[in-house]
A protein has these predicted regions:
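SF2 helicase motor core recognition
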Residues: 109-110, 149-165, 183-191
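Alpha-helical elements of the RecA-like P-loop NTPase motor core of helicases
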Residues: 15, 57, 110, 114, ...
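C-terminal accessory region of SF2 helicases/translocases
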Residues: 193-280
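Conserved nucleotide-binding/hydrolysis micro-motifs of P-loop NTPases
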Residues: 10-14, 48, 54-55, 62, ...
Length: 280
C-alpha cells in the first residue's frame, strides 16, 4: 500500500529552502556560462529537501564558499526539529511491526536516530562498507532486538528484510532506480504481510514535483509493487535525469512552466521505458 505523505515546512525551513534554491538558481547560470560542473548544485538542492542537518554538514565541511553561505548556515543552525521528523513520529505511532527508514544522507540518518532514541525507540543504523557477514549481523540484531532500521542508500545493497513490512522514504531520490531498490528490500519473495510504503514529500518544493513525476507520470510505485517490474534505464540516463530536473527547476519562469516542463519530462521517461520494454 502506497501512502504519499505531504509535509508542510516550518517558517524557518521554508526560508532556508528559498535561500538555497535562490543561490542554486543564480550560481547555475554562472556555471553554465563558464562550463563549470553543476553537480554540487544538484547536491545542495537534494540535501535541503532531505534535512537542514544534511545541508549544514555539507556546507560546513565543503570546499566551496560563497557569502550567502553565512546566512544559510546561521539559519540552519537555528532549526532543531524538522517538520518531516514530526510527521515520521506520527506515522510510527500508528504502525504495527518493524520499520525501515531510508535517507540518502548520513547526517539525516544520524539526526533521525538520535531523535527517535529520545522518544524511546530501539534503533539500529545501516550504512555502506559492511562485509556480507557484517550485513547479516545488523539484519539479525534488527530482527531480534530493534524497532527501526535507518539505512542510507549505500547500505541498501544486498539487504533482504522480508520480515519487515513498513518502509518510510524520508527523502526521495531523483533517480527512480534507487526507489525501486529501496522497496525491493522488503517487497520480495518470503514477504507474508501487507507492505506499507510511506513517501514523505515537502509541499511547495522540488520534492513535490519529483513525487508527481515518479508516481503519476511513470507509475513507478504501481509498477514495482504490482509486478516487480524493473526500471530499464542505464546509469548515464539516470545521471542526466538529475541534471534535467535541476535545469527545469532553475529555468522555469513560473509555476505553470514548471508543471509543463515536468510533464514533458515524465512523458519522455515513459516513452523510454515503453521502448526498452519492447526490446526485451
Amino acid at each position: 500500500i502506497i501512502h504519499n505523505i505531504p509535509v508542510r515546512l516550518t517558517e524557518k525551513e521554508q526560508r532556508l529552502y528559498e535561500l538555497v534554491t535562490g543561490f542554486v538558481k543564480k550560481e547555475y547560470w554562472r556555471r553554465r556560462a563558464g562550463r563549470i560542473s553543476i553537480l554540487n548544485l544538484i547536491t545542495y538542492q537534494r540535501e535541503i529537501c532531505s534535512s537542514s542537518f544534511a545541508l549544514l554538514k555539507a556546507l560546513s565541511s565543503g570546499k566551496e564558499y560563497f557569502p550567502v553561505f553565512e546566512e544559510i548556515l546561521a539559519l540552519a543552525k537555528e532549526i532543531k526539529i524538522n517538520a518531516k521528523m514530526k510527521k515520521v513520529l506520527e506515522i510510527l505511532k500508528n504502525l504495527d511491526g518493524q520499520t525501515i527508514i531510508f535517507t540518502e544522507y548520513r547526517a539525516t540518518q544520524i539526526y533521525i536516530a538520535r531523535f527517535l532514541e529520545k522518544q524511546g525507540y530501539k534503533v539500529i543504523l545501516f550504512n555502506g562498507g559492511l562485509t556480507n557477514s557484517g550485513k547479516e549481523y545488523i539484519k539479525y540484531i534488527f530482527q531480534k532486538q530493534k524497532d527501526i532500521l535507518i539505512s542510507t542508500e549505500a547500505g541498501s545493497q544486498g539487504l533482504n528484510l522480508q520480515f519487515c513490512n513498513n518502509l518510510i522514504n524520508y527523502d526521495l531520490p531523483w533517480n527512480p532506480m534507487k526507489i525501486e531498490q529501496r522497496i525491493g528490500r522488503i517487497h520480495r519473495l518470503g514477504q507474508t504481510s501487507n507492505v506499507n510504503i510511506y513517501n514523505l514529500f515537502t509541499l511547495d518544493t522540488i520534492e513535490e514535483k519529483i513525487l508527481k513525476l515518479l508516481y503519476d507520470k511513470i507509475n513507478l510505485f504501481k509498477s514495482v509493487m504490482g509486478g516487480m517490474e524493473k526500471i530499464l534505464m542505464d546509469g548515464e540516463r539516470m545521471h542526466n535525469l538529475e541534471k534535467d530536473i535541476l535545469s527545469i527547476l532553475v529555468e522555469a519562469n513560473n509555476e505553470d512552466e514548471l508543471e509543463e516542463r515536468f510533464a514533458e519530462l515524465g512523458n519522455s521517461l515513459q516513452g523510454v521505458r515503453d521502448y526498452e520494454k519492447n526490446l526485451c
